[in-house]
């Protein structure tokens, strides 16, 4: 029976699954991040290879088994040149007879729909979007962060909360409950104490991503937090609008798959704001919040490449989804670059 390797790699974490053509999940492992931008391409592949060895041992398949397809979906692999280089280097590892490389937004889209096309917006630590037409045409975004005009995701939401808290404290901005809750998250009393801790290195500024759930929680009762959430919803709607414009007219309803930690938290206020914005686009859109980690989408794409039987897809969703839940694999974060 043909085997498939599925990888969803981000800056913070990597999930790797080994599955059979009939959809059975043979192994699921998690390890450190494997973004080429963070670790170099060979360093990223080294990390994936270590996880593959672990998965082979866990599955009992052994080193002698033959993997037909490796589906590697990696954060930060956005440009055609990056994809081509990563594909050549991965092929040289000899993991599988065939290797496919792409950005991790493809994993989220495939995990959320069996149609093979639609729009995916991923909102984890950063934000990204993919549009895929029925005929295969793509609408992509570089998603390199501020340098490509991006705003959104846990980092930007958290940083906005820190800024709002500081301006509330010194009077330059409106009062907000974030003035107390933001420093309290780090065990501090005031935004100024937090600023000093970040300035001196006592607190890593990257930890602002931890504040995103706090902003969502306070938005119903705090106008400033609500404004941050409204901005996030507006950015998501803008990505969908542009993707739709690039893809052109479609004769049937378009599924918009929402993934990543911030969106999969299913915050009612955020989802309502997104739905309201999408309704103004005057198109037939169906919103889907994906419940599965992106590695499941990578595995489904691998089954597509194998020409797996229809029964394999339900089995894979069930078995790999259950394995992910058992190991408490939350949706992976999507990072800029």
Where are these regions (language model features)?
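Phosphate-binding/catalytic loop of phosphoryl-transfer enzymes
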Residues: 77-175, 180, 324-337
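Solvent-exposed beta-strand sheet faces enriched in polar/charged residues
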Residues: 73, 102, 255-259
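ATP-binding/phosphotransfer module of carbohydrate and carboxylate kinases, centering on a glycine-rich
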Residues: 1-63, 67, 111-117, 163-337
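N-terminal loops that bind phosphate or other acidic moieties
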Residues: 73-77, 123, 217, 227
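Flexible, active-site-adjacent loop/turn segments at secondary-structure boundaries
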Residues: 75, 139, 145-146, 192, ...
């Amino acid at each position: 029976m043909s085997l498939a390797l599925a990888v969803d790699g981000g800056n913070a974490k990597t999930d790797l699954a080994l599955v059979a053509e009939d959809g059975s999940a043979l192994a699921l492992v998690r390890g450190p991040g494997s973004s080429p931008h963070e670790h170099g391409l060979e360093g990223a592949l080294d990390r994936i290879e270590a996880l593959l060895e672990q998965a082979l041992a866990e599955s009992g398949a052994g080193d002698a088994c033959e993997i037909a397809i490796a589906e590697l979906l990696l954060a930060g692999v956005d440009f055609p040149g990056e994809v081509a280089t990563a594909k050549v280097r991965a092929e040289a590892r000899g993991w599988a007879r065939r290797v496919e490389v792409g950005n991790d937004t493809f994993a989220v889209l495939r995990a959320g729909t069996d149609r093979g096309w639609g729009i995916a917006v991923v909102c984890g630590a950063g934000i990204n979007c993919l549009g895929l037409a029925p005929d295969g045409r793509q609408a992509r975004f570089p998603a390199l962060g501020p340098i490509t005009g991006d705003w959104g995701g846990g980092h930007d939401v958290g940083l906005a909360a820190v800024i709002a808290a500081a301006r509330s404290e010194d009077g330059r901005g409106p009062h907000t409950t974030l003035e107390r809750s933001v420093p309290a998250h780090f065990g501090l009393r005031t935004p100024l104490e937090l600023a000093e801790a970040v300035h001196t290195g006592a607190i890593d500024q990257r930890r602002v991503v931890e504040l995103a759930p706090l902003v969502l929680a306070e938005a119903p009762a705090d106008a400033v937090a609500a404004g941050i959430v409204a901005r996030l919803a507006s950015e998501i709607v803008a990505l969908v609008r542009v993707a739709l414009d690039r893809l052109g007219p479609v004769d049937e309803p378009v599924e918009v798959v929402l993934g990543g930690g911030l969106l999969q938290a299913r915050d009612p206020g955020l989802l309502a704001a997104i739905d309201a914005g999408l309704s103004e686009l005057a198109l037939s859109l169906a919103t889907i919040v994906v419940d599965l980690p992106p590695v499941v989408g990578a595995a489904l794409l691998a089954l597509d490449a194998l020409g797996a039987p229809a029964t394999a897809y339900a089995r894979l969703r069930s078995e790999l989804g259950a394995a992910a839940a058992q190991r408490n694999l939350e949706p992976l974060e999507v990072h800029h670059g």
